Amino acid sequence: MIHTIPYFDAHCDTIHRCHTAGTPFRDPELRAFYDAAGDLRRSGGHIDLERAGGFSRYAQFFALYQSPRLVPEGSSMPEQGVLLHQRFLREMEENRERILPCRTGAEVDEAVGQGKAAALLSIEGAELLDCDIRRLDTAYDWGVRLLNPVWNYANRLSGSNAQQPEQGLTAYGRDFLQRMEELSIYVDVSHLSDAGFWDVVRLSRRPVVASH
């Protein structure tokens, strides 16, 4: 059975905030912002499961995201990606009576059919994969079905809306997009440069998402 889902949000940074909560930032406002996130069940952020429990049918893409400025010394963006994924899995396990991780439309239907929220995974900024085509297979195995090539910063795939907006997809970025499509990972054009956006529209054979 295919369910109509009236509440389907394509982007949130909740996992990032849960992962970063407890970091001893020197800036008290920054520390308070992240510490307020708590966990997925009850959060001071925009999304938590207690509030979402009021929705009849609800699906949510959770972004794996990290700001390069917040990567701890001695860590790396790919390592942060692993830790974020682990935090996502932990939240799914601790809240399995309310939410189920989903990889396919059929699994989304199954989750909402059980009266639970459906959780899907995205990656915001390919830096979490070191912009490495070979790491896309790992992301797919994690359950990632939506990916932003860039966040605020230009990278080896494309310029961003905030940095090098005239730079479209690089040759490597076009190869990266092709591999995403082979894996059935949708491209999210949010934060892309204007030139990169039009390159994606021209080259993509699958629907394109602008989540925010």
Model-based region annotation:
Residues M1-E166:
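N-terminal hydrophobic targeting/anchoring segments and the immediately downstream early-domain regions
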Residues I123, W151, V189-H191, H212:
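Short, structured patches in soluble enzyme cores that scaffold and shape functional sites
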Residues C131-D141, R145, A162-V209:
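Histidine/acidic residue-rich metal-binding segments in metalloenzymes
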